Amino acid sequence: MTKYTVAVAGATGYAGGEALRILAAHPAFEVTAVAGHSSIGHRLGEYQPHIPQLADLIVEDTTPAVLDGHDVIVLALPHGASGALAAQLDDDAVVVDLGADHRLERQQAWDDYYGGDFYQHWTYGMPELILGIGSDGKYVRQRDELTGAKRIAGPGCNVTATTLALQPAIAQGLVDTKSIVADLAVGYSGAGKNLKRTNLLASEAMGSASPYSVGGTHRHIPEIRQNFAHAAGLGASQADMFSLAFTPILVPMSRGILASVSAKLTDEALALTDEQIHDIWVQAYEGQEFIFVLDPGVMPATQNVLGSNAAHVQVAVDRRSGTLHAFTAIDNLNRGTAGQAIESLNIAFGLNDATGLSKIGVAP
């Protein structure tokens, strides 16, 4: 198998570390350069000791001179840091941005939630994203857009969980799009590796749960609404059709997301049986090898997907309130970030989607 060289920027963080962990065992990719900021000149093993195969790589400065010359460049940088850098990179390289700089299609959405310079939207790296239903009655998917892509925007982790939970309902018109509520239990690694008051002391973090970015302020909201618009077969300009009350909650686990997403069912959808509604999810993810729709009544659990690129999905109906409840469990660093990015890279290079990726979680 041909080996493609890879440079990873942001190599000492959580997202960069997970990308390196997966790439270290990937049969088609070889990590030959790592870059950082405060870690320049140090061995990678000082920061990512769980990857002994790459321990002797020296962290270099995050510059085009270091990153160029590789077949693949992975940018695991905070939002606002990758946009200007990416504009200077070699056009021949395949670049995947794990940050937010190239996810949003509308500048107004960027200005409202991020601010600063707005950068060009890249090919969106969620292969299973539904883009409406074709004239043949089959789901159109983002996967086809990724074949041969040179610039890939990795989705947000919360975005991934929320989108995978509800997009079948959006595509089939089952719910009132002004009634969507998403509550997510999120592990601490989702907040990044920088020290914060909320996660600095184990004595305060463990055994405690706390919401954050409440009141419609979380930066993943416009991206989720953008995805819902696409699932309905609409453009990003129609994202305002979707109202989303979104609340993430930090819970005392190192990684993982459990998304609970609800919306009012339409009268037509209420006429369907629970089995018919469950079957819509089964059909929506048929052939999507990383998405597992669980048997009726079996609820997703973060423990069952840790370390994998899998997503476990379930749907239930509350007949008394006329509400649909959809659930997704993912590993935020793998399926939610690095694993999904490498799945997209596999597609871009014409490899099997699952090359170098696991569908099996770690238990206990």
Curated annotation (Swiss-Prot):
Active site feature: 157
Catalytic reaction annotation: N-acetyl-L-glutamate 5-semialdehyde + phosphate + NADP(+) = N-acetyl-L-glutamyl 5-phosphate + NADPH + H(+)
Keywords for this protein: Amino-acid biosynthesis, Arginine biosynthesis, Cytoplasm, NADP, Oxidoreductase
Major place of residence: cytoplasm
Subcellular location: Cytoplasm
GO MF term (any one): NADP+ binding
Signal peptide bounds: none
SUPFAM superfamilies: Glyceraldehyde-3-phosphate dehydrogenase-like, C-terminal domain (SSF55347), NAD(P)-binding Rossmann-fold domains (SSF51735)
Any single GO CC term annotated in Swiss-Prot or TrEMBL for this entry: cytoplasm
EC number: 1.2.1.38
Gene Ontology terms describing biological process: L-arginine biosynthetic process
Function recorded in the entry: Catalyzes the NADPH-dependent reduction of N-acetyl-5-glutamyl phosphate to yield N-acetyl-L-glutamate 5-semialdehyde.
PANTHER family on file: N-ACETYL-GAMMA-GLUTAMYL-PHOSPHATE REDUCTASE, CHLOROPLASTIC-RELATED (PTHR32338:SF10), N-ACETYL-GAMMA-GLUTAMYL-PHOSPHATE REDUCTASE, CHLOROPLASTIC-RELATED-RELATED (PTHR32338)
Entry similarity comment: Belongs to the NAGSA dehydrogenase family. Type 1 subfamily.
Identification of the protein by name: N-acetyl-gamma-glutamyl-phosphate reductase
Organism field: Bifidobacterium animalis subsp. lactis (strain AD011)
Gene: argC
